[in-house]
């Protein structure tokens, strides 16, 4: 079976041969003159023949991106499949797949093949703003700017290379139902994307991620030690002008003042 995919860095089309040999799936990349280090160093990629795959640590981020670009993500990867990324500050982040073809690409070309969020909360807690305000919602808040700057820069270079900007919908805050479109590389989930409904947030902030629609999937967050923590959502709290939505340690919907410290479980799309 031959699949044609677009290699975005060079604007050319490359071919992938997919075959089965000795009990493994073999992805054979045609890498002549393509200038992609991942392909040049590993032209043949063995994948254990377990489908869909749950542990993706034997694949590089570039290989995962290529499978998504070929339209094969859903049949190749399990919902909830995980991969670790060694960050530049020494933190080992683990990411899980929470959806396929869910997020709108910022360039208008369609849907991002795969959406991810962090399995355990990031090691540092952040506030959403320096002042107790949700004016401007996610689009204006300090945490969004830090996430797409400081936090993104700490991800491995390989992960940064495959993250695609997407459009995230969030209310304008200050008890408004107006929806702002934010272009993000890293983002927090909205209340609707996590719980599937608006509890303390304004309507129109995206759609329920497939992973969180499953029965027995917890909404609460754990830190790197396995302790439950209160996590931030990007949704402005609809009933006041000083808070953002959050998730309490029992997994219930809550809110906290924008100046409070809370756990981050960032997401991205590729």
Show which residues each predicted segment covers:
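Collagenous Gly-X-Y triple-helix signature in extracellular proteins
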Residues: 47-270
